[in-house]
Amino acid sequence: MRSIPIQQSPNQSITVTLDGNRWSLTIKTANDTMCVDVDLNDTPILRGQRAVAGMPVIPYRRLAAGQGNFMFVTERDDNPWWERFTVDQSLHYVTA
């Protein structure tokens, strides 16, 4: 599992290369929850996925073409929330 740097910001975009793939994530607020858009090698694979602690961001392995996945880790399994990013909530990449 590899830590992915996120900011304490309500809306942000991250682009990282992991395992030879270019991942682009957009994390944004939607009312009282966080949602994630994911692109793999410039191809959109997910839009508006609700961020849930301890669960894969990409809910179906086939969407990521057998590549890795992302997971929010939070204290007490609280729902991810931007004000807690870098305090007691983080984003991680898990290799397939």
Predicted stretch roles:
Residues 5-7, 27, 61-63, 83-84:
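Short, exposed beta-strand/loop patches in secreted or surface proteins that constitute
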